[in-house]
């Protein structure tokens, strides 16, 4: 683990930035070597990113998702894997210009957060606590994917209707994008529901905690979207817009700790239950 201990956010952040630059260049100049640079840089970044997380988990002897910094790093790692999966599955797909900005933004936010600034969950090694954190984070990633797919849907729709500056962007057919959106929404909802339910079961959450309020609001919006999507006739542009709204709500609940504050990770006074 000595080598892994020397890896910093700059290592994989720079790799993702190079990959993003190559994706933008590919948008203007679609040559094979540009795609190779984008893929290679992303693979190098994911390798360094994985070692960074493994080292942090090894040192702490737990899954590295116990505070805001680690959560940002973990979610950005999942998004990087999504990007690589998409471009390996379909080399012509313009996935990078949609997924990599999210990955880089999350890494950038983590870089400005003190790595040990949040108080880690004392029960972070328990199965239920780890499940609580993982289901919320994976559910957030799936909802981000649904939002990205919704944006792609709107761009594809505009391509078919008018043709725009994005005409060079290769996107799947509308029907496939709609199916991807449906699958992502139906996967995100149970994950976030389980994570939220475990959170209430494991902690005495305060209803006036901004973290709890924003998470509940996001869950209610997502629940409304999942119910709306259950109707077969509900699809198309309106569903895409509603998905983006729900995705923004989920992201606000995930990223809002430094802005709104929270008692979510703070230890209770001596002799009291955890909050």
Describe the residue ranges of each PLM region.
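Polytopic transmembrane helical bundles with strong interfacial aromatic enrichment
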Residues: 1-275
């Amino acid at each position: 683990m000595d080598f892994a201990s020397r890896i910093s956010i700059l290592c994989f952040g720079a790799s993702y930035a190079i990959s993003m630059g190559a994706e933008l260049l590919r948008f203007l100049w679609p040559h094979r070597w540009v795609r190779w640079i984008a893929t290679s840089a992303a693979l190098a970044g994911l390798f360094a990113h994985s070692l960074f997380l493994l080292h942090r988990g090894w040192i702490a002897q737990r899954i590295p998702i116990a505070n805001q910094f680690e959560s940002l790093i973990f979610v950005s790692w999942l998004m990087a894997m999504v990007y690589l999966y998409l471009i390996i599955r379909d080399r012509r797909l313009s996935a990078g210009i949609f997924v990599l900005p999210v990955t880089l933004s999350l890494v950038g936010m983590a870089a400005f957060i003190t790595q040990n600034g949040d108080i880690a969950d004392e029960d972070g090694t328990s199965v239920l606590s780890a499940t609580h954190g993982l289901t919320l984070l994976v559910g957030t990633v799936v909802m981000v994917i649904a939002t990205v797919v919704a944006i792609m849907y709107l761009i594809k729709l505009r391509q078919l209707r008018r043709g725009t500056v994005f005409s060079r962007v290769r996107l799947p057919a509308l029907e496939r994008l709609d199916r991807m959106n449906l699958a992502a929404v139906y996967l995100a909802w149970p994950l976030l529901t389980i994570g939220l339910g475990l959170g209430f079961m494991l902690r005495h959450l305060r209803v006036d905690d901004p973290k709890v309020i924003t998470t509940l609001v996001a869950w209610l919006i997502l629940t409304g979207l999942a119910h709306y999507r259950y109707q077969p006739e509900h699809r198309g542009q309106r569903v895409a817009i509603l998905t983006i709204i729900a995705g923004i709500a989920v992201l606000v609940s995930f990223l809002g700790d430094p802005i709104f504050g929270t008692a979510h990770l703070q230890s209770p006074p001596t002799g009291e239950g955890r909050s």
